[in-house]
């Protein structure tokens, strides 16, 4: 009997040997697709794989990953609760910033990941993930820790853990934003009937939410 794959598995398979952009020829070891709970209500999206991620084939396994694990725990979450992916699926050489053509090539696959997982809440880590999902050139320090109801999910931008490791003054704001994240999750969680645990039951964004539209208009007006 032929093996049946889920849409997420099909997408991962289609990208296994991806050569759609120049990153495939610039020293990457492998495509780093994503990892976690395929039915997660909460998804985290970073920028791109680093050295350790490229070696192991999973997002956030280096120092930034260890910090992320601590932050998740502070918000009452674990890796098994969430799904983690990056905008860019291949490591840029020397960990440089992604280039626009690379983002444009990879973005459709990120959006397909999000559609397959169907999270209610997406936490974007850093500038690139936030700008890609908001589709606006806006700095993460301006929007971090805020709620953006989009068409299919709620976006919650956060500072990137790697930035906090390189700039120690960002660590406390990052921890504070994870406290806000926990408060938001707690507000929108409901107890499971079979046990004393809680399950995240975040509401879908409301069409025509004028408060969120006004927030975005204020942010992006120039």
Predicted regions: what is each one?
Residues 1-190, 200-203, 211-222:
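A polyanion-binding, active-site-adjacent surface
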């Amino acid at each position: 009997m032929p093996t049946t794959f889920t849409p997420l598995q099909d997408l991962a398979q289609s990208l296994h040997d991806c050569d759609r952009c120049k990153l495939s020829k610039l020293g990457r070891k492998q495509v780093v697709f994503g990892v976690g709970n395929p039915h997660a209500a909460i998804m985290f999206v970073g920028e791109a794989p680093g050295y350790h991620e490229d070696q192991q084939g999973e997002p956030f396994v280096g120092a930034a990953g260890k910090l992320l694990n601590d932050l998740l725990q502070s918000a009452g979450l674990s890796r098994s609760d969430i799904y983690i992916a990056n905008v860019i699926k291949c490591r840029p050489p020397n960990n440089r910033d992604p280039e626009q053509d690379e983002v444009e090539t990879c973005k459709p696959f990120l959006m397909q990941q999000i559609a397959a997982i169907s999270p209610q809440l997406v936490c974007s880590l850093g500038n690139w993930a936030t700008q890609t999902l908001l589709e606006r050139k806006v700095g993460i320090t301006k929007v971090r820790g805020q709620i953006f109801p989009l068409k299919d999910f709620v976006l919650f931008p956060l500072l990137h853990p790697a930035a906090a490791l390189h700039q120690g003054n960002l660590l406390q704001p990052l921890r504070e934003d994870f406290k806000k994240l926990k408060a938001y999750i707690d507000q929108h969680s409901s107890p499971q009937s079979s046990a004393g645990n809680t399950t995240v039951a975040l509401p879908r964004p409301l069409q025509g939410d004028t408060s969120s539209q006004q927030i975005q208009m204020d942010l992006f007006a120039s």
